[in-house]
Structure formats: structure tokens, C-alpha cells
Amino acid sequence: LVGHLDTGADGRHPALRGAIRHFAEFDDLGRERRPGPRAYDPDGHGTHTAATIAGRKVRGTLVGVAPGARLASAMVIEGGEVVARVLGGMDWAIGRGVRVVSMSLGFPGYWPDFLALTRLLRGRGVLPVFAVGNEGAGTSRSPGNYAEALSVGACTRDRKVPRFSSSQRFRRGADAVVPDLVAPGVGIVSARPGGGWQAMGGTSMATPHVAGLAALLMEAAPKKTADEIERALFESCRLGPEMTADRAHRGLPSGPRALRLLG
């Protein structure tokens, strides 16, 4: 079960039918709205990221990274990113028993507001996979810049880091650079509310690739912990010929390599 905190998700889209196990919507005070609505998405961002994680095959080769995964999807971005909504969604996801949380959102700079819940996710054996941001080198967003998060930047199909992908160095020991790794985040085609498809770009699109890959590895190696899954992902990474560690850190992960590392 993968936690998905975004603008919601269109549960009627063919690629997401049967994929959304839980859905919730939160108000500006971080309270769950009841009765809960059927899964929907007034924006499109969340439907795109949800289908990247767990989209079922509809036609051709369009399919999510982990098409057998189920989602606990929370609408926490509605007319802007509100801290209380995100905190409410994170707490709700913990209560649903997720093993991975994918958050393609963030607040510019370093905000400590989400640190306690991110640490709680870790303490519960949940892998927090968060976007680093889209403001370029020398910048990052919270909670994607926490040491406790698996921070994701973007890369192109030819394994280059696009200018928009954020990266930043912090004074905190060995793991001082964010993002931790990069994933495809340019021209990504995924679901659009209403049954269609659209291409989008950003670290928002890269993050669900990594969350989906983590879910696949957890399915293949169910006895492995979130920390072990993360370690395998990190050790599977390789820098592309034009990637640098200050922008891509470890580089691009490989599912087959990570699975071999898990034994």
C-alpha cells in the first residue's frame, strides 16, 4: 500500500480503476472531511502522479511503475499547499498502514513543520519519498530536503539533470547533498482526469517513479525493511555521463540491480 499525497486522484480513470484503496480530503485545519468523497482530482497533478505509481495497463505500453500496487490517496493540495492539510494527510497515511509515502509537493527553503511526522514515518517502517523542488541549483523544498526523507530530483531520457531540478548542500555530515537520487521527470506521459493522458514534467513526476520502484521491490522482497529497500536503491544508482554528484548525488537507480542487491 502506497501513500499518495497530492491534489487527489480520478478514481474513475481506466488506469486507476481498482488502484485506490483509500481516499480522503482535508480542510485548511488539517481535518478529514466527512463523509469522504469518491476519489476525484480537480487539478490533474495528482491523477498524473498516482498513475505513474500504480496505473493499470489500459492500452499500448502506458502503465504505472507498480501496476499491482494499491494507493491510499489524500487530497492535500487544493488551491495552494497548506501546511495543516499536508500534516493531516501524512498522519492519515500512517494510520492506513502504508509502506511508502509519495509526496510531489514542498515548501521553498527549510521548514521544520513536517520533521516530526517524517521521523514517525521512519519509525513505523515507512519509506518517505519526497520531491526536492523545481527551482534549480542551490535551492530545495521541505520536506524533500530533510535528511530523513528519500529526496528525488529529475533527469531526462538521455540521463541529464534539467536546469529546473533543485539541488542543495547542507551541513549535516556524509549525506549532505539533496536530492539523494534522480528519476525521469521530463515529458512524462500519464493519466489526466476524465480518462485522457497528458505529458508533464518536474521533480513531481520523478518522485512517483521512485515510490513505485520502492513498492515493486517491497512486493518482490516483502521481508526487507524500508531502510534495506532504500539502501538497495541507493547502491543501484549510477551517474549518467553528463551528471555530477552535486546535481544528481548518487544518480539514477536501477530496479534489476536493486533487486539483486536485496538477494
Go through the PLM ranges and name each one.
Residues 1-33, 48, 52:
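Acidic-leg catalytic submotif of subtilisin-like serine proteases
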Residues 6, 24-25, 141-219, 223:
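Extracellular S/T/G-rich loop segment that most often corresponds to the catalytic His/Ser-adjacent loop
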Residues 8-11, 28, 58-59, 77-80, ...:
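Solvent-exposed loop/turn segments at secondary-structure junctions
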Residues 76-148, 175-176, 191-207, 246, ...:
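Substrate-binding/access-modulating region of protease and related hydrolase catalytic domains
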